[in-house]
A protein has these predicted regions:
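Enriched for short, Lys/Arg-rich terminal
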Residues: 68-108
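Basic, Lys/Arg-enriched alpha-helical interface segments
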Residues: 2-63, 105-108
């Protein structure tokens, strides 16, 4: 399946990459990117890999999430032959707030 990154998800990924690069250096940044792209490849082969995201259960489509590492997860939904990555969450933050931000960003 093909992977489509929504602009907000790509923006959040870039923010995380920038933070890791600044705070922890190139080696840590490369390791994180390797984990993120590995997760993306796994999703392409196994679209239902992630469980249904409970904080988005009332949404009009079935959102799923998959953990990239212990601090981040990808939020996505399956649209025909495409996996639509709609957000990139920090697992340390309030999940209800992130869910609302995801819904709000999809409305605009």
């Amino acid at each position: 399946m093909r992977i489509v990154w929504y602009p907000e998800a790509a923006k959040r990924l870039r923010q995380v990459v920038s933070y890791i690069q600044t705070e922890y250096g190139s080696k840590s940044c490369a390791k994180f990117l390797k984990e993120a792209y590995r997760t993306e490849r796994l999703l392409a082969r196994n679209p239902c890999l992630g469980p249904v995201e409970p904080f988005l259960a009332d949404a009009p489509v079935q959102y799923r999430s998959v953990v990239v590492n212990r601090l981040n997860k990808i939020v996505y939904w399956i649209d025909g032959d495409a996996i639509e990555i709609v957000d990139f969450w920090d697992t340390r933050r309030e999940p209800q707030k992130q869910a609302q931000q995801t819904i709000d960003s999809l409305k605009s």
